[in-house]
Regions:
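A short, mixed-charge helix-start or loop-turn motif at secondary-structure junctions
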Residues: 18-22, 100-104, 142-146
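A glycine-rich, hydrophobic loop/mini-helix early in the fold
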Residues: 31-57
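Amphipathic, non-membrane alpha-helical segments in soluble helical-bundle scaffolds
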Residues: 22-33, 56, 60-63, 107-111, ...
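Residues that form generic nucleotide/phosphate-binding pockets
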Residues: 12-15, 19, 28, 39, ...
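Acidic/histidine-rich alpha-helical segments that form the ligand environment
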Residues: 27-41, 96-134
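Terminal targeting/low-complexity segments that flank the catalytic cores of oxidoreductases
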Residues: 1-34
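Short, contiguous alpha-helical
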Residues: 1-14, 49-93, 119-122, 134-171
Length: 171
């Protein structure tokens, strides 16, 4: 296995994949899993309701989005890894965010959920065989491999950590 290449994913995922380090999925876990978890674990409660501009997501909403999206990407990964050839639909992240109001949730509970979700995803990725990683399917109208989905999952999280650090006054 090597890093995903053009044709293994929709071009809109290129940025996510570019944020990752590693040439095989297990290297993604060793290179990124701990940093992602430590960053999320370190978000203080007083920052949870902060949004950097009117109409932008709060950190709490961002975390909910990250969890929802990871679950969707993992579902795609399992679907394709298990050989189901049917195309998977896309999703509207803003509609999902509006339908899953996070403002009532306790940040500590969200962090715990995120940590458990991340660990579950890592265990799933570690269990994949080369045959499963090579499986190809379609999601959101674009071809995607299971291998590419591993990179997309990590890259999506890294993208949002970068956004939080850059725009959410998080130091």
């Amino acid at each position: 296995m090597s890093r995903p290449s053009e044709g293994d994913f929709g071009v809109f995922y290129r940025h996510y994949i570019s944020l990752t380090r590693g040439n095989i999925p297990s290297e993604l876990i060793s290179n990124h899993a701990k940093d992602i978890v430590e960053f999320i674990s370190g978000i203080p409660e007083e920052k949870a309701s902060y949004a950097y501009a009117e109409g932008k997501w709060t950190i709490r909403q961002m975390l909910q989005h990250m969890m929802d999206t990871e679950r969707i990407f993992v579902y795609r990964l399992i679907w394709i890894a298990r050989g189901d050839g049917r195309s998977l639909p896309g999703f509207d992240e803003n509609a999902f965010a509006a339908a899953a109001p996070a403002s009532h949730r306790k940040l500590a509970e969200m962090k715990e959920e995120f940590l458990l979700l991340r660990r579950s995803t890592d265990l799933l990725i570690e269990s994949l065989t080369n045959k499963e990683l090579e499986q190809r399917g379609e999601a959101s109208g674009y071809p995607v491999t299971v291998d590419a989905l591993c990179y997309i999952i990590f890259g999506h999280n890294l993208h949002h950590l970068e956004v939080i650090m850059r725009l959410y006054d998080f130091t």
